Amino acid sequence: MAEYEIFFKESVWKDIKKVPKGDLKKIIARIEKLADDPRPLGSEKLTGEELYRVRQGNYRILYSIQDKELTVWVIKIGNRKDIYR
């Protein structure tokens, strides 16, 4: 399987600043794994949108996949209680 390239939406950098450092390391590791498998076990396609989400502790990572370009765009990172608002 080909490796996907990871890109971040500009607003994700603001989301990252809100995440505690201990959780941030785990989130970054989880995002890096998306390059090898953008649809890992436990990922879920969001209803009505071309977005996927993966869980990392109490945080959710929302992203889109472009299979033709082999890219993954991280759209949003946030706490599970706030991410879908």
Ranges and model annotations:
Residues 29-54:
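A short, surface-exposed loop/turn module that caps and links secondary-structure elements
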